[in-house]
Amino acid sequence: MYGIKIYNTLTRKIEEFKPVSPGFVKMYVCGPTVYDYNHIGHGRVYVVYDALKRYLALRGYHVLHVMNITDIDDKIINRAHQEKRDWREIAETYTRDYLESLGKLNVKVDLHPRVTEHIKEIIEFIQILIDKGYAYVAPSGSVYFEVDKYPEYGELSGRTNKELWSQEKEFISEKKKPYDFALWKAWKPGEPHWDAPWGKGRPGWHIECSVMSSRYLGRQFDIHGGGTDLIFPHHENERAQSEAAFGVKPWVKYWVHTGMVMMGSEKMSKSLGNIIPLREAFKEWGPETLRLWYLTSHYRRPLVFTEESIRQAQKYYERLVSVTNTIKKLSREAVSLHRMNDEDLKILEKLLEIRSRFHEALSNDFNTPQALAVISEFMTLVFKEIQYNPKYMLVLTAYKLLREFNTVLGVLDKYLVETPEELETLLDNVINIVVDIRRELRERKLYDLADRIRSELGKHGIILMDRGKETTWMRRK
């Protein structure tokens, strides 16, 4: 099996993937600020890291996937003022929309920490930075990270010129340098606040992710994800404050970023007013089509929205459903057993080669468009050859391969859930295959192997009865 390689934004290289703890992957992805409905740009982030998690699990890793919910922020407060509603009501409304969107996209996140549930930990983290000399309290009661104290600042984003670091310009008058950033924002009348040793206020944006990721994944973890628009300043600031607080380098082993969803030449964003809400996209095209569409472009590249690209994803999904139904039908109808001839073996070799190339694509920096192209070859093979030569071994191999593909794609779950009757038929088919192979072993006088098969099946309640060259079987009641 191919070793997994992935692009690391920090080093600008594709690197061999080796988690901090062998066999266990800890992954943090920046989640939404819940002040509005999710749009299809958000959906790409959700699906890409879910599919990456699924592939790592397929390769035998245990993956802990954490994605935060920012439920207190300037945007939430502003929305609450505009609508004359409580900020908590705003956050809860759009949190529900976010979680419903994940469900429809078949995205499974292990933990969803919320900022408001971690205020105590945030205050403690800021105090550590103050005590270590990396942060200072301004006269207003706001707390800022002193960027010049962290020499590696700018490495993640590639911004070596300090003139490109300026941020949070509305606070520039009380900061030591224009590029220092807020860890704690002093309270203003009409805003929510919490008490802290340096004065009441609320957390800055960047500190939240550092605290919640380390709370659940420890002081060093494997993958930190998000869109490329978060590299600066958000992820640059996270890295600086976390390595300063923990004294651990690297804080994150692999920085993995997804490209933006584009509307023509512009990034899809609420500020530009060119968004398509996910809830509308679900009605128009369906979540399965959207999920596949997100995977048609390499995760690091921009994904340009066009009606035609969505239609192509829809056709691909319809073909996947068709091939699934065809394979299930063949598994029920192909009742006769025959020895594999040379032509059968060639088809089997093609199936195994397709599986190998599927893993080759995903192992090489998670190349989903290449993996989808390989799956297209699989579908053609089923429709043009296996459909007209439904030998059990070929049909069973194709079925297992389809399930493996769907482990990552996640769009065929409702078609691959077997009823008890289908499971019974599948089990009977597998036993018949094993019995047929055992008969050939007996004909070749490989009695030790034949006896071993009889013994192993017997342990599972399957009794074989030989009568001359023929074998029948029954289940022990």
Curated annotation (Swiss-Prot):
ATP binds at residue 270. GO terms for molecular function: ATP binding; cysteine-tRNA ligase activity; zinc ion binding. A motif ('KMSKS' region) lies at residues 267-271. It is found in: Cytoplasm. A motif ('HIGH' region) lies at residues 32-42. Keywords: Aminoacyl-tRNA synthetase, ATP-binding, Cytoplasm, Ligase, Metal-binding, Nucleotide-binding, Protein biosynthesis, Zinc. SMART domains: DALR_2. Its EC number is 6.1.1.16. GO terms for biological process: cysteinyl-tRNA aminoacylation. Belongs to the class-I aminoacyl-tRNA synthetase family. This is Cysteine--tRNA ligase.
